[in-house]
Swiss-Prot record:
Its EC number is 1.2.1.38. The gene is argC. Its main location: cytoplasm. It comes from Xanthomonas axonopodis pv. citri (strain 306). GO terms for molecular function: N-acetyl-gamma-glutamyl-phosphate reductase activity; NAD binding; NADP+ binding. This is N-acetyl-gamma-glutamyl-phosphate reductase.
Length: 316
């Protein structure tokens, strides 16, 4: 019996994440790319901009109602923050059964939406057709903090450094290679959206200081954790190993991971466990590709989970 592929549309397909999504959809045996929406690229062939896609589809400039009329089985919204609501409203009205995955921060605090960080929230998925994809920094922070959450004596301090692709394609200081050359650019040093996101998800205050670096892709997250009681390095390492033993996308490593080794890869590396004298303060480092596990790969995990497929279909 032949399984009919599910149709999928991507809104905001010009961006870096949109490009990665197209690659993953092209590799997926059960998905058919039915539309891609981009105002800037409207009329141009997708294959001219993305080597992974070999079909005849062209970019379209679709408003919210036009997207809803397409009646795709799945719609992924890869739009800047604050832009998703009209599309969600139109789909809610026309085809509420459509699976919507939103990559912006717009619905991460909405309890009606499933918050899709599979390694931590998979067990709470209950068939929701509205899924909010976590932030890139927020993914790295939560995966690093979670194994020690019950041992925390105070707010984790998280020093994050991202490649400039995290600043999107709209020109700004934070994605200007000339300004970033030989530079590190701190920004939003308190109350960053991802700081609030992680605090809400984990139920503890978190302190986060983000920076943009000259490399294109990949995040390094260095997390300082104060512990209620002394733990040995072996005990801490065991917590991470046991917590993620069945998670193919999470690799626990001995040395502190390098961002250059994770760029272009779907997973997360966590390691470099270093204790301060007294064993009540530990520093742990995580790396991930902000465009993949921080965005497109995670969206594909959530899509597969929601449709009852192997979570890593098209990913490995």
């Amino acid at each position: 019996m032949t399984v009919q592929p599910k149709t999928i549309g991507i809104v905001g397909a010009r961006g870096h994440t949109g490009s990665e999504l197209i690659k993953l959809v092209a590799a997926h045996p059960q998905l058919h790319l039915s539309f891609v929406s981009s105002r800037e690229l409207a009329g141009q062939r997708v294959a001219e901009h993305n080597d992974a896609y070999q079909g005849q589809l062209r970019y379209e400039n679709l408003d919210a109602d036009a997207v809803a009329v397409k009646a795709a089985d799945v719609v992924i919204l890869a739009l800047p923050n604050g832009k998703a609501a009209p599309f969600v409203a139109a789909i809610d009205a026309a085809t509420p059964q459509t699976l919507v995955i939103d990559l912006s921060a717009d619905y991460r605090f909405d309890p009606a939406w499933y918050y899709g960080l599979p390694e931590l929230t998979r067990g709470s998925y209950a068939g929701q057709r509205r899924i909010s994809n976590p932030g890139c920094y927020a993914t790295a922070m939560q995966l690093t903090i979670a194994p020690l959450l019950d041992q925390l004596a105070g707010p984790p301090q998280c020093f994050g450094v991202s490649g400039y692709s995290g600043a999107g394609t709209t020109p700004s200081d934070k994605n200007n290679p000339e300004l970033l050359s030989n530079n590190l650019m701190p920004y939003a040093l308190t109350n960053h959206m991802h700081e609030r996101e992680v605090s809400a998800q984990l139920g503890v205050p978190v302190e986060f200081m983000p920076h943009v670096a000259p490399h294109f892709r990949g995040i390094t997250m260095t997390v300082n954790l104060w512990l209620q009681q002394p733990l040995t390095r072996e005990q801490i390492q065991a917590r991470y190993t046991q917590r993620y033993a069945d998670e193919p996308l999470i690799e626990i490593v001995d040395e502190a991971p390098w961002v250059s080794r994770i760029a272009g890869k779907h997973g997360v590396q966590i390691g470099g466990v270093t204790l301060a004298p007294g064993n009540k303060r530990v520093v742990v480092v995580a790396t991930l590709d902000n465009l993949l596990k921080g965005a497109a790969t995670q969206a594909m995990q959530n899509l597969n989970l929601a449709l009852g497929w192997d979570e890593l279909m098209a990913i490995r």
